[in-house]
Structures are given as structure tokens and as C-alpha cells.
Amino acid sequence: AVMTPRVAGWEGVVFQPVRAPAEGVRTRRLSPLMLAETFLDRLERLGPRYNAVVTITRDRALAQARRAEAEIPTGRYRGPLHRIPYGAKDLLATSGGIPTTWGAAPFKDRVFDFDATAILRLEAAGAVLCAKLAMVELAGGMGYRQPNAAFTGPGVNPWNRDAWSGGSSSGSGSAVAAGLVPFAIGSETWGSILSPAGHCGIAGLRPTYGRVSRHGAMALCWTLDKLGPLALTADDCGLVLEAIAGRDPVDPTTADRPYRYPGGGPAGRRFRFGVLRDITDGCEPEVRDNFARSLDVLKGLGTVDEVTMADLPYDDITRTILFAEASSAFEDLIESGGIAGLTAPEDRYTAYARDAILAKDYLKSLRLRGVMAREADRVLARLDALVAPGRATVAAMLGTEVRSAIRGTARDMMGAVGNGAGLPGLAVPNGFGARGLPTSLQFMGRAWEENTILAVACAYQSATDWHRHHPEEF
């Protein structure tokens, strides 16, 4: 079922792309305080239905909104995110007594005395933090196999109460799709932004590794982790990325590459798309059908050519790096036996097996990652984007086992290459599949070329209306 956003009263700002309420705030037709109240109400009233929220930051949000009431009349307008409410995945540190739980029961009362850089940059852009959003415990780093792997319960998909919203940024996906916040910040090590975005019918952007500071974010895998936005449209993702991107002296992995988002790109531009041979193998029939229809749309926007990549163990390379670094990142928790307090039973023992990864295998994977990155760049050098189904299947049903490329029970060449080589990727909705659940289309580009795939995705969304479909409340 789909709904048309209501236009009467303050609820009329729900399911609107960021630029709409931003213009209302700028012209003083919308009160920042009432805007915050609208989404705080939805978070409090609807958040529990989706297991989407860990902590509602009402006091902080209202204080920020009140400051905006005083700033805007004086002409101090900070840009399109000025006083736009948002939520942050609960692996980003927040001060002021707001817990940062990492989705894990052993840390549910833990607080920090500082804010993550991404939180500070959004505050500087004028955005209003309304909630810390639920996530799979420890961002899935302990090897979970089913949706119920968080002390807040499984992420519920707003399109079907019996389906999962996807991991590990489950609350971010649910909250945006259900209209609880206009945008959210998630993280991806392998699939944790693109998966909930695709399963929930919204847009999700994985930036180039090093584009966004991870200072104050939980570390799962130092050489794979990335922070990025989930929002209603690709254009929204670009606006948010501009706010959070940039070098950070306290995160030495960030690159000294200033980033500006120019908008959707020049009208009438022709793009060059590539499709990897056999990329739809293993996809559900509806996913394949929707991808084929998406390719027809893309052929109206440019050229679509089949491409091939060298035969390398892409999944194994990225999987070995992830497993080895995760076992190191959580060494104290694992060796102390603290993982016994996690929610998913398999998370209490799977991590021990990863301690058996040999140093020579980790180092071999790091060396092969360089080969993988060069091969990906060879293919992408003559393209604007590689395109593929966002996910091979629609969202899993609650209570079932989740197929995962990370565990080797599913294939995800795009995810392995994109995350292993640190390349930007973007998922947008492209239809519906089994049980009325969304399917998605993903674009992957060269390192540092987020604006190219954003332009591609904006062009696709200008030619389709899947991003205007929203779930009914339940």
C-alpha cells in the first residue's frame, strides 16, 4: 500500500524532500520549533512500532530549534539543513548525558562526554538532532544471522510489519521510510547503508572511504568503516554529505579533499553506465524484472554496456579483512567474555572463530585489495557508474535466517568491491517485489566522484516516481 503525504497542518512536512521544509524555514513560513515538535511527536508515537529508536533527544532538539527561532529573523541562515530534524545511528557519540549504546545490551547505559565529528558538523549546519536510532548490536560485527540482534528488538520494515528493515543501520532505514525523521546518519562496513535503504524504499549513500570523519563513531573495521546519509532522495543525500564531509585533524584517515554538492547535475547530460555480466544471478524474479525495467530508463539517460572484471576472490578479500579487524577492534569484549551479554545467541560465540585468522591471510588480503581497487578503477575509468540491483532479494521476514555475503551465504560482488576498494555507492528505490516490499537500484562510481553518482541517481529519480511512494502507518 502507498500513501500520498498529507498536506494539511504541520504533518504536511512529513515525506517531503529536505529542500521543501528548508525553504519554508528560510522564508519563515515554517517554525523550526514546530518542525522539531512534529518529528519528535512521530518518533515518540510511532518509533516503538518499528523498534527504530533508542533515545529521543527531545531537550537537545528543542534547545537547538529555539536558537533557530532567534537566528533566522536576524538573517543568520546556515543553509538547506538549517533546523531540519534528523536521527543518528547509535554508534555516534553524543554528549549531554545521551546514551551511546552501539545497539548492544552491555552498553545500554553508557554515555560519553563529547560529540562525534559528524554530529558536530551537522549542528554547525543547523540540523536538529532528534533521536539516536537503533542498530544491529556492534554493527553486526559479531556475526549475527537473524534480525533479532539488538536489545531494542528487530528492525521492523515500515512496508510490512512482519519484515526486517535491514542491517546494521536498521533504525535509520525504518525511521526515514516511516517519516519519523527527514534524514538519518548510518554507517557501512559492508552493506549497512545500502541494505536498509534498499529494503525500506529510500535513498542511501555510502561515501568514499576517508570522505567523512569517523571520530566518535564505534570502530568495527578500521579500513572499511564509512559514515553516510539515508534520506528520501538522492538529492537529500548530497545535501547531507556536504555538511558532514571534509578533513578532520582527529581522524587521520580523512582526506584533505574539500567537498561541495552542486545539486543534481546539468540537465540533459548523457551518462555512461556499465553492468557486470551475470550480476543478477541469484536475484529474486521481481528483483531481476525491476532491474531490467530500470535499465530501460537508464538507456534513455545514456548508454548501457556490459562489462567484465578480472576473476578475483572479491568477497573473500573483503570478508577476511573485515573478520580480522573486527576481532581486533572488539578484542577486550571478546576475551573478557563480555559478548555473553549480547542479544543474538550466535553473537556470543561466532567471534571466537575469527581469532583463528592467520596474519599471513590478512596481509595477503590487504595486498589483493590493491589489485581489486586497480581493477575496479580500470573498469570505472570509462564509465559514470556501474549499476546493479541494490539487493538480490527483498527484505527478509522476521524470525528467519538472513542471507549474508559477509558470512558467505550470499554473493555480493558490488558490495565486496565497493567496500573493499572504498568506492562510493548509492541505492535508490526502483519498484516493489514479493509481499509488497521495495526493491532497489545501486550505482557505484570511482573514488571521490560522489557527485557523479548523485547526478546519475537524481536523473533516474527525475524519470521515475518510486521515491514518492510511502508506506501507510500501522
Language-model region placement:
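Serine-dependent amide/ester hydrolase catalytic core
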Residues: A20-T27, T38, R42, A70, ...
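Conserved hydrophobic/aromatic pocket- or pore-lining residues that grip, position, or stack substrates
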Residues: F39, A61, K89, L122, ...
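Structural helix-boundary/capping segments
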Residues: R45, A124, V128, A177-A184, ...
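Short, well-ordered beta-strand elements within core beta-sheets of diverse protein domains
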Residues: A20-T27, G87, P106-V111, D225-L232, ...
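Short helix-loop capping/hinge segments that flank enzyme active sites or metal/cofactor-binding pockets
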Residues: P5-G9, H82-W102, A267-L276, I321-D377, ...
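An N-terminal boundary/leader segment
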Residues: A1-A63, G300, H469-F474
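Short glycine/serine-rich loop/turn segments
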Residues: L81-L227, L276-D278, G390-I406
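N-terminal, positively charged, Ser/Thr/Ala/Gly-biased leader segments
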Residues: R29, L33-A36, E44-F112
